[in-house]
Structure formats: C-alpha cells, structure tokens
From Swiss-Prot:
PROSITE patterns: EF_TS_1 (PS01126), EF_TS_2 (PS01127). It is found in: Cytoplasm. One of its GO terms (biological process) is translational elongation. The lineage of its organism: Bacteria, Pseudomonadati, Pseudomonadota, Gammaproteobacteria, Pseudomonadales. One of its GO terms (cellular component) is cytoplasm. Its main location: cytoplasm. Belongs to the EF-Ts family. Pfam families: EF_TS. GO terms for molecular function: translation elongation factor activity. Residues 82-85 are annotated as: Involved in Mg(2+) ion dislocation from EF-Tu. This is Elongation factor Ts.
Length: 289
C-alpha cells in the first residue's frame, strides 16, 4: 500500500477544496495517485450532485458587473438551498467567476454559462452538500447603463438613452425599492389589465352591488388608472423626491429610459414547506432502526 504523506493530502486539499479526511480517504483508495483521486472525487461529486438536484434551491445571490464605460452590464442569479451558503466564500467565489465569464464572453443567455461552469458547480455541491444552480442572466447594452445592488438579494440594471451613469444608478435604486412591473403604461398587456379588473370586481362585489353600470364602469376605470400609475416605472414618484415622477426625472436630465431589468433572489420559485417536527421525528425513527 502506497504511503499517504501530509504533503500529498495538502496538495489534494488545495486542488479540490475538500476536507483533509476526505482527501486522505480518496488518496488511500487511489493508491496514492493524486490524479486518480481527483477523478474519483469528481465522479463522487457528480453522484452527490445528482442526488441533490431534486432539492429546491430558492435562496442565493444576485450579482452585476458593469463595463468601465457604462455601455454594457451583465446581471446573474445563482441559487442555493440556504441563505447561509449564499454568504460563504466558496459560493461567492463561484458566483464571481461565473459573472466574470458571462461578462467577458458577452453571453446573453444562461445555457452556455451553465454548461461551462458545470464542473465547478459539481465540485461546490460536493463540498457544501447543497444544490446550486445558475438560474438566469441578462446582458444589457446601451448608451448609458447603470446598476444597483441591494445586498445580495436584489439587483437592477437600467438602460438610458442620454443622461449619465449616476442618473442610471439612481433610477436603478428606485426600481429596486419600488418594483415596477412595466416601463410605461403602453407596455401593459390587455391580459394584465383584464386580470386587474377581475380582481377589483371580486374584492369590491359588495360595494358595487346594485350600482348603475356607468358608475361601476367609472370605478373600474379609476382602479385601472391607479394600477397603471403604480405598475409603470415612468409614472411612479421617484423615491428620493416623491414630488417628481421617474419619467420626468429622466426628461429633466435629457434622458430617456429605454429598459430595466430587476432580479430578486428566488422570485417565481416555489419553495418547499418544511415540517420541522415531522423531519425531526423521521430522523429519530431512523436512529432506532
């Protein structure tokens, strides 16, 4: 049996990032062959990752990188199972490297990034025991591009025609805080308006009961107008100065808001409801078998 030295274990730890005992065990199984140990550990990591793939990853981080000339930016979301992992250096490093690759290669879709980062993802899953996924990315290019990050959970990129980076950042901060659904009322679909009308009628059934049709129609129009103002970025009062609408703020600076992208960690992902009492009971039962 080949002798497993401390130097061999140290080298394997540095190359894989895994624990000392796990590295020593892998070296022993590989007969002291470091390259074989790495291959075996990668294979084991893939198996672990496959087992973790069904676990819902609804926490994680949003990251943004902007070009030095403020002409382009990339925003990505990488998910983990817990917010605890999202705050750890290993996860942060994976996110940063993924963002850098997406930015440098001018990727516009997550698919090629997911493929390119799969080996690193498997290694992270094997090391942390949590499912990790690169969920989405958007690249924005334009005249003036600005961004704002609220911690690691909300990120916004704003594209302006005219204006300056500081204005773009201010508007991005507003988008992070106010969460507009559309750029302007003209972008609101008939489907969204119909849904809002349906909700209004359902919630106010008692108030409108017995009222003339024209009165009800005016009530609906009022609600739709309010909805359009609340949901449209250009119609919202600017968070730093509520006396000015965001659209007017841009115009005063000689700018036009072309588009915005807002990411929030886990939005749209259905989170699992955990019954901790049942989970503990199951673990206790397992120890008695």
């Amino acid at each position: 049996m080949a002798e497993i030295t401390a130097a061999m274990v140290k080298e394997l730890r540095e190359r894989t990032g895994l624990g000392m005992m796990e590295c020593k065990k892998a070296l022993t199984a590989a007969g002291g062959d470091i390259e074989k140990a790495i291959d075996d550990m990668r294979a084991a990591g893939a198996i672990k990752a496959a087992k973790k793939a069904g676990n819902i990853a609804a926490e994680g981080s949003i990251a943004v990188k902007i070009a030095a000339d403020n002409k382009a930016a990339v925003i990505i979301e990488v998910n983990s199972q817990t917010d605890f992992l999202a705050l750890q250096d290993d996860f942060k490093g994976f996110v940063a490297e993924s963002l850098e690759k997406a930015f440098n290669e001018k990727l516009t879709d997550a698919a090629p990034l997911v493929e390119a980062r799969e080996e690193a993802r498997l290694a992270l899953v094997a090391k942390t025991g949590e499912n990790v996924n690169i969920r989405r990315l958007t690249r924005v290019e334009g005249d003036v591009v600005g961004a704002y990050l609220h911690g690691h959970r909300i990120g916004v990129v704003v594209n302006l025609k005219g204006g300056n980076p500081e204005l773009a950042k201010d508007i991005a901060m507003h988008v992070a805080a106010s969460n507009p659904q559309f750029l302007s009322a003209s972008e609101v679909s008939e489907e969204a308006i119909a849904k809002e009308k349906e909700i209004f009628l359902a919630l106010n059934a008692d108030k409108i009961a017995g009222k003339p049709e024209n009165i009800v129609e005016n009530m609906v129009k009022g609600r739709i107008s309010k909805f359009l103002a609340e949901a449209s970025l250009v119609e919202q009062p600017f968070v730093k100065n509520p006396e000015v609408k965001v659209g007017d703020l841009a115009k005063q600076a000689g700018a036009e808001i072309v588009s915005f992208v807002r990411y929030e960690v886990g939005e749209g992902i259905e989170k699992a409801e955990v019954d901790f009492a049942a989970e503990v009971a199951a673990q206790v039962a397992a120890t008695k078998q």
